[in-house]
Amino acid sequence: MMSTKRWVLIGAASAVVLVALVVGALVMSTGAGRGSAASSAAPTTVVVVFAMAGEDGVQAAQLVAAVDVATGAFELRETSATVSIPGTSYSRLRDAYPFGGAQAVAAALGGGSIAAGTGWVDVSQEAWQRLLASGVDVTIPEAFQTFDDVAERYSDFEVGVQHVAVEDLRGLVNGVAYLAPDSRQTILNALAKASLRAMASATPSQGVLTSLTTEQWTGFAKALAKN
């Protein structure tokens, strides 16, 4: 009987090349390391960007969540949405990441500049994997399989609740792009919820870059813990 699973090849053969992981220290200072200084006013919304190598081998914004600082509630932003990225020919939100990280993504969401009352958090691929080192429970609505021919890693995602090991995180993130919109949204919502909850206990050694001050981060982390 023919399998109904979707196969996704991740790696050199499909132009998805695992590039060097970005290692960065947590910067708890206003606008540090990403260009323009952030507003002195405490943000009411924080754009959290989780990065991972995309199909062209370049780090991209794979998961973008706009988080309410007061409640910790979040709304995912469509990473394939059309935006303006100054100085480039790229037009998808996810592609803003190489041109300034989470700050560039937040600016793209704001139509070219970061909206008033908005902060940002930049979670690199390595930092994301570290946050979810113990894996994550996700409900898989649609079965699919991935094979990373660079890392030589095969990942099998069955329908139902599944504990996804951190070694399969890249396969999950890249594979969901080929699923039906509803299936993709279900998986990304669960992944965002778990990732934000894990970030609530992040420490400076975990490689997260942010525009928030130390005091603002403390309050934000408390809100994230509600997820």
Predicted regions and their residues:
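Non-catalytic, solvent-exposed segments at the cell envelope interface
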Residues: 4-14, 25-227
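Hydrophobic alpha-helical transmembrane signal-anchor segments
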Residues: 17-20
